[in-house]
From Swiss-Prot:
Its biological purpose: Probable DNA motor protein. May track DNA in a ATP-dependent manner by generating positive supercoils in front of it and negative supercoils behind it.
Signal peptide boundaries: none
GO molecular function terms attached to this record: ATP binding; DNA binding
Name of the protein: Uncharacterized FtsK-like protein all7666
InterPro entries named in the record: FtsK/SpoIIIE/SftA (IPR050206), FtsK_alpha (IPR041027), FtsK_dom (IPR002543), P-loop_NTPase (IPR027417)
Keywords, comma-separated and alphabetical: ATP-binding, DNA-binding, Nucleotide-binding, Plasmid
Residues annotated to bind ATP: 382-389
Domain FtsK: 363-556
Note, other: Although strongly related to FtsK, it lacks the typical transmembrane domains located at the N-terminal part of FtsK.
């Protein structure tokens, strides 16, 4: 048969003869390898490739026509997947399936082919081949041709190769000083949403470099409309304020000083800075002028300078060393993308665990050091669309990607069930993400017990009091991991009547001494209600992160200062105040997990598979066993309620009952110290009673009794009397 092929030059006839020969060889019992060997010896390479294709088709057809009544879809998917991997053409697969499958099965085949092409992991050879093809396109054609080639690719892994090449070429075009309109035109020419996004980001970088404001509008059909403000000269373009009269920063500063004089506030212009979110003008108040005069002048400035400075919202006014600053919102605001600040190259610093903070007015990246005594625990909050969730996700993503599980562990609570769900299943988690008040109470109780076991470990070694000292002595041979407990929307948790006592008690214990044991609490809420979040809890957070709030009092509660209302003037979407020993205004990093899911998922995959060369210290406390021990066998008879909460035990230890309806209160040392501490901080009587005894006016006679005791104790203390009542 092969001799007949050699003597005939008609290609189609040759293929038909080769098909017949292969079918006969299969019937004679020859294996695929034996058939290919014979073809390679007698025929040219082109026919060897054709023979391989024929064998794939025969094998695929044989699997579908096996002697059974019917096959399930799982088997069909497996057969299709093997055929695709073997290189069988889609049309050939569909043609064979049309002969052997029902209509429903045939429809399944079509969807299966689409899914396989989209999600299969290509071989290294295939990846290299696609990459070389893209390089050839870039070297010989405009970048639009690369866009078209990427759009024709179905597989997400091969597309990712193209996306990386697109970013490299866009960066080169940026260095070649291409105008903003060039990149927005590229975005409009591409149908791929990720390529559009990369082009728009580059346009934003050009706008930042040239000082030109950028207004990108997306139409209903996905097209991007560019609106640029035309500057009068290059000097103005390099300064940051956009307005109808086009002012330089120096001119804007002098105009601000003149306007302040109209309000009988004498000041002198000092300097100005361009930031990604706002422009900062610093002035020096004349001697004798109080800061209170300018503290709430923001709305008046909008009225007086709204047109000249482009003010649409009141600027934030703050005191800084050497003057007072006015933060003027930028009309061409820039965002800080997470991926632009981290490459995750090199080994992590296992002794200095930190989380991303943001970018300050100078464009400098600022991190939040959890290992610092000025941080340890963080209280944060702000209204919807303030950027709180993005800040939290950036912190988690950074921690799991930068540090292995032996260095950092996570305890997450998400009662909204929408923020932390993407992180479930990570090896860094000490327990599954808590999604209700009960599971959060269990998680916090577990951390309290873990804290105690860590301090017991410290006691076994002389001169060790903190996790920093422990790791300094024993790491890297044995490292005690830091545990970051991040709680989203604590308002719902602390409003739960069944579990609020347990949660409050556990939080108080953790905030009191868990920082030294390497357990850090990050507590966030949209509603920082002073009647819900215990004052004693709020006062034990050394660090605060305040996102934009709706009410001035919310700003005061988060920042721990009843006079600091500045969070009301924040711009939202990641603009926040970071307070420790000083207050910084930062732009939080934007994770963009919805805009760029491939990058987000890639970091999660790397976090799961990262190398962990360290040996972690283990307390031996198993979460599931610990939770089971919290409930006794009779829990089913009392509807699963916790036997005796720590809060109840604490309250009983502070009271000496003398009958059913009357009792004498005797304050122990802990209660006296707590009362004095809160009193010195300016807390009112009802706030102290709530913090120390967990009682409010709704508790009736019990509340009145304890309130009288606290009041008498404070009066006696002022008068030099006895502490006990």
């Amino acid at each position: 048969m092969l001799e007949m092929y050699i003597n005939n030059n008609n290609t189609e006839f040759q293929k038909q003869q080769l098909w017949t020969a292969i079918v006969q060889a299969k019937q004679d019992g020859l294996s695929n390898e034996e058939i290919i060997e014979n073809v390679q010896e007698a025929l040219p390479d082109a026919m060897v490739f054709y023979a391989e294709t024929v064998l794939k088709q025969i094998d695929f057809r044989a699997k579908l026509s096996r002697p059974v009544v019917e096959f399930n879809l799982e088997f069909l998917f497996q057969v299709i997947y093997e055929s695709v991997i073997a290189g069988t053409n889609d049309n050939e697969i569909l043609s064979i399936c049309a002969e052997h499958c029902t209509l429903n099965q045939y429809e399944f085949v079509r969807y299966a082919l689409e899914y396989i092409h989209l999600h299969r992991m290509p071989s290294q050879w295939e990846q290299n081949n696609v990459y070389q093809k893209m390089i050839e396109i870039v070297s010989s054609s405009p970048i639009e041709s690369l866009f078209e080639y990427i759009e024709s690719i179905k597989n997400i892994y091969l597309k990712q190769i193209g996306y990386e090449l697109v970013q490299e070429n866009l960066y080169n075009l940026l260095l070649n000083n291409k105008p903003i309109s060039y990149f927005t035109d590229l975005a409009n020419q591409s149908k791929d949403k990720f390529i559009k996004n990369y082009c728009c980001r580059t346009a934003v970088l050009v706008a930042r470099a040239t000082g030109k404001p950028l207004d990108l509008k997306v139409t209903g059909d996905g097209s991007i409309i560019l609106k640029e403000t035309k500057y009068l000269n290059s000097e103005i373009a390099n300064n940051g304020i956009v307005s109808s009269n086009i002012l330089t920063m120096g001119q804007a500063g002098k105009l601000l000083v003149d306007t302040l004089e109209d309000f009988n506030i004498n000041a002198k212009y000092v300097d100005a800075k361009n930031g990604p979110t706002f422009n900062r003008i610093r002035v020096k108040l004349e001697r004798g002028v109080s800061y209170k005069k300018v503290e709430d002048i923001g709305n008046d400035l909008v009225q007086q300078l709204g047109e000249e400075l482009g003010l649409k919202v009141a600027p934030m006014v703050s005191v800084v060393p050497g003057g007072v600053v006015f933060d003027i919102p930028r009309l061409d605001r820039q965002f800080a993308y997470f991926r632009d600040y981290f490459s995750f190259d090199g080994e992590p610093d296992i002794y200095s665990v930190s989380i991303p903070g943001g970018v300050d007015v100078d464009g400098t990246y600022v991190e939040i050091p959890l290992y610092s005594d000025n941080v340890t625990h963080i209280l944060g909050g702000g209204r919807t669309r303030g950027g709180k969730s993005q800040f939290e996700k950036a912190a988690i993503l950074y921690l799991v990607r930068r540090y292995p599980p032996s260095v950092v562990r996570l305890a997450l609570s998400d009662v909204k069930r929408v923020t932390f769900g993407k992180f479930d299943g990570l090896p860094h988690l000490v327990a599954p993400v808590a999604r209700d008040a009960e599971s959060t109470a269990n998680l916090l109780d577990y951390l309290v017990e873990e804290m105690e076991l860590r301090y017991q470990e410290f006691e076994r070694h002389s001169s060790i009091e903190t996790i920093a000292q422990y790791n300094s002595r024993f790491a890297p041979d044995c490292i005690m991991p830091r545990v970051i407990c991040l709680i989203d929307e604590c308002f719902d948790l602390l409003s739960d009547d069944n579990y609020c006592d347990r949660i409050e008690t556990a939080l108080m214990k953790l905030l009191a001494k868990a920082g030294g044991a390497g357990i850090h609490v990050l507590l966030y809420t949209q509603r920082p209600d002073k009647n819900v979040i215990d004052p004693l809890i709020r006062s034990n957070f050394p660090a605060k992160t305040a996102f934009v709030t709706t009410r001035p009092e919310d700003s005061c509660i988060i920042l721990g200062d009843d006079k600091d209302k500045r969070a009301v003037y924040l711009l939202g979407y990641g603009d926040f105040l970071y307070k420790t020993t000083e207050v910084l205004r930062l732009q939080a990093l934007y994770v963009a997990d919805d805009e760029d899911p491939e990058y987000f998922q890639q970091l999660l995959l790397e976090a799961k598979n990262q190398n962990d060369p360290y040996t972690a210290w283990k307390s031996g406390l198993d979460f599931d066993e610990f939770v089971a021990s919290l409930y006794d066998e009779s829990s089913s008879n009392d509807n699963g309620k916790f036997k005796a909460t720590t809060a109840t035990k604490t309250k009983q230890s502070k009271t000496d009952f003398e009958g059913s309806f009357s009792f004498k209160v005797q304050l122990d040392e802990e209660a006296r110290n707590s009362i004095m501490n809160l009193h010195q901080k300016g807390y009112q009587l009802d706030e102290i009673v709530k913090a120390v005894f967990n009682l409010s006016r709704q508790d009736g006679r019990s509340y009145k009794k304890f309130r009288n005791v606290v009041e008498e104790f404070l009066n006696n203390f002022k008068g030099g009397g006895e502490d006990d009542i």
